């Protein structure tokens, strides 16, 4: 696997439960999958861990709140992020509104990818062509490898 390089900085996508990164081996409700329906994405984002909000102005965010803001940086506009940053720093943040906005922006980000995957999976003829090309390429590579193996072993019968 190759790490996704976003603006020359490696991106760690934080989980929705505030306990590290999103991972298929972790809490299923804290991870957004490209195959998740729009409603499932909204449901998962709305269950993201939050608290009652900051008690004092300009206090540092707890890790689980910082995770939500990191997710927003991946899919939300700069104006949206700035509005919620200001709300947080002024102790007027409404996490329900923040999560609704994040959920909609996440749906808008993931839906086109999911739709493209579904279109590819539903194109049986296209998939057959891809598999045929892959098989031809693998067969060619395997034949070359076997030729080298036979030469190395002195089994050049063909």
Language model segments and positions:
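Conserved nucleotide- and phosphate/pyrophosphate-binding catalytic cores
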Residues: 1-158
